[in-house]
Design a protein with these regions (language model features):
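Extracytoplasmic substrate-binding proteins
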Residues: 173, 294, 324-332, 346-362
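Intrinsically disordered, low-structural-confidence terminal and linker regions
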Residues: 1-40
Length: 497
């Protein structure tokens, strides 16, 4: 691994609130989207001349459109409950990575232009003009938030910094200041159908290769169908599952589950992506346009059910937004959840005894589980409260003998972010990603030391990609991370009657 241009934080035995380092991350900004990327999404190609007036007008539009945003602007009492809850503050010490300080970047503009006191007595209420210097701060620090929502769990008023960040990014896009990584990915989905830009013929070839590899492993014809009309299930999964390790191991696991259960399924070349970066940039229209591919594919293929693969923010969009974005789903079989997570699907089969496992097949692994933010704090799973926590763990303990959770304050709804979500999984933000992973790495280190953990399962493509990149910075092997259905794939018994 190449030498990093920054210092990796030291792992500590006990969590420590860092000393404040003013401006520690002020230098870090993601690449700005070039004109062609902006134009393709309908945004101004470069920063518009009257950007200040348009930004203020856009803020006014969002304040009227999303009542919660105005509540968040008004409700904060600066109690400090959130200040040490952000993984980026814990990893960098930059006070502007405290959730309250990140909110205040917008709040001081809100007060200046949308409150009586701010208009006439700005200094008394901390209101400031929207200058280019302030805009640059916005671009830096609103692109240092992974929208994980951990801070909102601890806020006594439930202020959601993720929503504030989304609003700020939407404002910046509207005046021609977009983030390259996220906007480039959204453009690929519109042009090709997935985040990685894998065209249909390449996808078909990849799936054929996986079928051959799986037959070599199992001796059985486990299918990876594409664009099959009349299949019962349409699987919408992150495109990383088609492309790289460890993601592809979970795709193989999905296929084995469908095979063992005897349920017909298909992937779609039109909707070959579960991820939806429209949510990360806070743009409802982009989110809807990406999601509409799923509806069109489901109608075209005539499926009865839609199942979503292992992707955290994709599941949040599906669970929390699809109904209003692309519903109603009256053309699907209403006996099943709409949509349904692949873990719900597999767990249901396990509970009914429809699939069986050899748990000993995973005995070389001592497993822990990383709760992904958008699953933990942006959705549910199954019919019971907390199902998003119970179901993945129940699958793991059904397919493996050795499982240990990490420390209680680092899991479930208090889980720490992987450090790469929210549109930040780009190498121009690598320093932030590595430092932001510190709290999770410390919890993992404790589990390794106390229980001999050697495998961290997760159900998010971004988490898998992020951990694969940052684990070596903290002395761990990148192969330590993988999907829940990677474990399922290893243990499932195929061909049993």
């Amino acid at each position: 691994m190449a030498t990093a241009a920054f210092e990796t934080p030291k792992l500590r035995r006990y969590p420590v609130i860092p000393l404040v380092q003013v401006g520690a991350m002020s230098h870090l900004k993601p690449f700005v989207a070039a004109a062609p990327l902006q134009k393709a999404l309908g945004f101004p190609e470069t920063l518009v001349e009257d950007w200040q007036a348009k930004a203020i007008a856009k803020m006014g539009e969002l304040l009227g459109k999303y009542r919660s945003l105005q509540v968040y602007m008004d409700a904060c009492v600066h109690c400090g409950a959130c200040s040490d809850k952000c993984h980026y503050f814990l990893g960098t010490g930059d006070p502007k990575n405290m959730p309250v300080a990140r909110q205040d970047l917008m709040r001081k503009i809100y007060r200046r232009y949308f409150t009586f006191a701010g208009k006439y007595f700005p200094r008394l209420v901390g209101a400031v003009d929207l200058t280019r210097e302030v805009l640059d701060e916005w671009y830096s620090y609103f692109n240092q938030c992974s929208e994980c929502r951990r801070c909102s769990v601890f806020c006594p008023y439930g202020i959601d910094t993720a929503e504030v960040t989304m609003a700020a990014r939407e404002i910046m896009d509207s005046i021609g200041l977009g983030q390259k990584y996220s906007n480039e990915i959204i453009g690929k989905v519109h042009r090709i159908g997935n985040n990685l830009g894998i065209p249909g013929p390449a996808l078909e070839n990849t799936l054929e290769g996986l079928a051959e590899d799986t037959k070599d492993e199992t001796g059985l014809d486990v299918r990876f169908p594409l664009d099959v009309k009349g299949a019962e299930v349409l699987l919408i999964t992150p495109s990383a599952d088609f492309f790289s390790e460890p993601h592809v191991e979970s795709l193989i696991g999905y296929a084995k589950v469908f095979h063992a259960a005897g349920i017909s399924w298909t992937l779609s070349s039109l909707a070959s992506e579960a991820g939806n970066f429209g949510m990360f940039i806070g743009n409802y229209d982009q989110m809807q346009r990406i999601s509409m591919r799923v509806r069109e594919a489901a109608l075209e293929l005539g499926v009865k059910r839609i199942v979503v693969g292992e992707c955290g923010h994709a599941w949040r969009v599906a669970y929390s937004f699809w109904n209003t974005l692309i519903g109603p789903f009256d053309f699907l079989d209403q006996r099943y959840p709409v949509p349904q997570h692949i873990c719900e699907f597999t767990d249901d089969l396990i509970q009914r005894g429809a699939i069986r496992f050899d748990k000993d097949a995973n005995d070389q692994r001592v497993i822990t589980f990383h709760d992904s933010c958008n699953v933990a704090r942006g959705s549910r799973m199954g019919s019971m409260p907390g199902g998003q926590f119970i179901i993945p763990r129940r699958i793991i303990t059904s397919v493996a003998n050795h499982f240990h959770d990490m420390a209680p304050h680092t899991i479930l709804e208090s889980t720490f972010c992987c450090g790469g979500g929210g549109g930040l999984l780009t190498d121009d933000l690598l320093e932030l990603r590595v430092k932001g992973a510190l709290p999770r790495m410390e919890a993992l280190k404790d589990a390794v030391d106390e229980h001999g953990v050697n495998f961290m399962a997760t159900i998010c493509a971004i988490c898998k990609a992020q951990f694969t990149k940052v684990l070596p910075y903290y002395g761990f092997d990148m192969s330590m991370v993988g999907g829940v259905h990677q474990l399922v794939s290893k243990a499932i018994r195929l061909g049993d009657k």
